[in-house]
């Protein structure tokens, strides 16, 4: 029996990703002025309309509308035909302060910070790719990233901002994985030459990415399977912050606790603890303790320390699980304040996470491999 696994990604122009970017752009602007601010910002997008809401407690002065329009403009939504226009769309703001009840548990003092909510978070790493991420999600990200880049550079004729990718990897021979199928759905102008459009996608995007990963190019190809993708963006589908949590993480290859990332400051463990769990899992795998590691962590609202931590190696461990648990406990502190300090999560760097995955990019602090030497000892 063949072993096939599939993951998907979306471009920065996807309606849900528009919302993630606006929420994280607002978070960054708040943190620039007030690093200790409490932020939970949500965005809703539909045809030429945005609603920005949430709870934000800060001393910062923020122009929410300007930030939202700037994000839309940078993506390329500057035309009414695209579903939303940065210059003409209506924007409503419904932002309030954080609940005083929640603040009781979080604002303990500067050194002891309670978790912003209860919940479970997962972190995962595998040695099947250079980024320590599963191949399917990694390739999916690269496809839409390249397509968007070519569009912005004016090299991708007829393409519009809304794009999706889906990659199926054949793991029948686990030592030699292959691409089975690549699907791309790319919004396009009303008038275009379909054959030329599809030929460009196969040769200049799909094949280029496959070769980058030193994988086969004789895969099954699906491009805009309905035959037409003119109506897209928030006109084609309503967008919401936090609705692409599997795209943001491991493409379904690892479990997910259900909490979204974007628009949340680091006291929200949905985000910060998931980053820390990824950081720990990646360093443990890079140290050679296992081929695959998944870490689950849980918290109670207002409590600074996790309620539980669980490690799964899927039978790929190279040392005993006791040794792996010891390495985790000795090298990684999952208290909320220590996560924030270790990963430097008071800085305004979150907008970069809102597209093409929160993991696998070397510039992020939770992707550094600074614990490997210590663990190997």
From Swiss-Prot:
The protein's enzyme class: transferase
UniProt subcellular location: Cytoplasm
Signal peptide region: none
Metabolic or biological pathway: Amino-acid biosynthesis; S-adenosyl-L-methionine biosynthesis; S-adenosyl-L-methionine from L-methionine: step 1/1
Residues where ATP binds: 14, 162-164, 228-229, 237, 243-244, 260, 264
Keywords from the named record: ATP-binding, Cytoplasm, Magnesium, Metal-binding, Nucleotide-binding, One-carbon metabolism, Potassium, Transferase
Coiled-coil intervals: none
Enzyme Commission number(s): 2.5.1.6
The UniProt record lists the keyword RNA-binding: no
Subunit text: Homotetramer; dimer of dimers.
Protein name: S-adenosylmethionine synthase
């Amino acid at each position: 029996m063949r072993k096939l696994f599939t993951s998907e990604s979306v471009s920065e122009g996807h309606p849900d990703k528009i919302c993630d970017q606006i929420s994280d752009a607002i978070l960054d602007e708040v943190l620039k002025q007030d690093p200790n601010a409490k932020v939970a910002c949500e965005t809703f997008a539909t045809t030429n309309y945005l609603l920005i809401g949430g709870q934000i407690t800060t001393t910062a002065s923020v122009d929410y509308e300007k930030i939202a329009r700037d994000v839309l403009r940078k993506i390329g939504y500057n035309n009414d035909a695209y579903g939303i226009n940065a210059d003409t769309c209506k924007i409503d703001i419904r932002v309030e302060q954080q609940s005083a009840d929640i603040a009781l548990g979080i604002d303990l003092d500067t050194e002891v910070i309670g978790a912003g909510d209860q919940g479970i978070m997962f972190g995962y790493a595998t040695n099947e790719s250079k980024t320590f991420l599963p191949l399917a999600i990694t390739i999916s990200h690269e496809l839409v990233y390249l397509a968007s880049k070519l569009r912005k550079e004016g090299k991708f004729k007829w393409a519009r901002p809304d794009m999706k990718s889906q990659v199926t990897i054949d793991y029948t021979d686990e030592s030699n994985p292959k691409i089975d199928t690549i699907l791309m759905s790319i919004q396009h102008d009303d008038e275009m030459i379909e054959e030329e459009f599809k030929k460009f996608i196969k040769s200049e995007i799909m094949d280029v990415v496959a070769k980058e990963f030193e994988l086969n190019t004789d895969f099954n190809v699906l491009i805009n399977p309905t035959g037409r993708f003119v109506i897209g963006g928030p006109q084609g589908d309503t967008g919401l912050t936090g609705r692409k949590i599997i795209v943001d993480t491991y493409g379904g290859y690892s479990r997910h606790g259900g909490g979204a990332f974007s628009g949340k400051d680091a006291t929200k463990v949905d985000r910060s603890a998931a980053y820390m769990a990824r950081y720990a899992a990646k360093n443990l795998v890079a140290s050679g303790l296992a081929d695959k590691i998944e870490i689950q962590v849980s918290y109670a609202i207002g409590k600074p320390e996790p309620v539980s931590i669980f490690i799964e190696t899927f039978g790929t461990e190279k040392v005993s699980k006791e040794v792996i648990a010891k390495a985790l406990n000795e090298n990684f502190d999952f208290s909320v304040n220590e996560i924030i300090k270790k990963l430097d999560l008071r800085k305004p760097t979150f907008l970069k996470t809102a597209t093409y995955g929160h993991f696998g990019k070397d510039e992020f602090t939770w992707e550094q491999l600074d614990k490997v030497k210590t663990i190997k000892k």
